[in-house]
């Protein structure tokens, strides 16, 4: 089974085992779904009892925990789902973990690997890095010409100053 992270545990919240998390999904409604979730490095199977969003953070209560001491060890770990429970994406949309590691090319010349995706309000920014330089490229059609997951490639446009 392959696990996909859907939230990062930042801290505990209160004394009853609630966890404060940073969502790693645009689809917050996914936490309403009756699917299996796995918590932490040991992938402990958990059931979401309740969740809420507040100021961009996700707060989740699990049926399995009702005391802060039971969840302290999960800080800086992740909440996962099984890959089979991923949403189908529209054409032209990609999961970030599928993009990481793509080989980036500009005018047919290798310029580096896609190492990170920064999500900001207007659009994502792809971070492409080689041994000497780092490029930050807006994830818009003017700069991203082609993404080929099958062959592990991304064709980009670089302008002066990137």
UniProtKB/Swiss-Prot annotation:
Keywords: Chaperone, Cytoplasm, Ribosome biogenesis, rRNA processing. Residues 91-162 form the PRC barrel domain. SUPFAM superfamilies: PRC-barrel domain, Translation proteins. The keyword Chaperone applies. The keyword Cytoplasm applies. GO terms for cellular component: cytoplasm; ribosome. It is found in: Cytoplasm. GO terms for biological process: ribosomal small subunit biogenesis; rRNA processing. Belongs to the RimM family. An accessory protein needed during the final step in the assembly of 30S ribosomal subunit, possibly for assembly of the head region. Essential for efficient processing of 16S rRNA. May be needed both before and after RbfA during the maturation of 16S rRNA. It has affinity for free ribosomal 30S subunits but not for 70S ribosomes. NCBIfam families: 16S_RimM. Binds ribosomal protein uS19. This is Ribosome maturation factor RimM.
């Amino acid at each position: 089974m392959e696990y996909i992270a859907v939230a990062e545990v930042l801290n505990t919240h209160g004394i009853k085992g609630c966890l404060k998390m940073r969502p790693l999904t645009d689809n917050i409604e996914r936490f309403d779904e009756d699917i299996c979730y796995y918590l932490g490095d040991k992938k402990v199977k958990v059931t979401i009892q309740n969740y809420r969003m507040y100021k961009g953070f996700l707060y989740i209560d699990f049926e399995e925990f009702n005391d802060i001491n039971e969840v302290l060890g999960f800080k800086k770990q992740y909440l996962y789902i099984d890959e089979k429970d991923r949403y189908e994406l529209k054409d032209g949309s990609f999961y970030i973990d599928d993009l990481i590691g793509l080989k980036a090319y500009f005018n047919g010349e290798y310029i580096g690997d896609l190492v990170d995706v920064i999500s900001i309000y207007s659009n994502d920014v792809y971070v492409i890095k080689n041994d000497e330089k780092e490029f930050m490229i807006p994830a818009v059609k003017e700069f991203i010409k082609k993404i080929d997951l099958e062959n592990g490639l991304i064709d980009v446009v670089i302008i002066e100053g990137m």
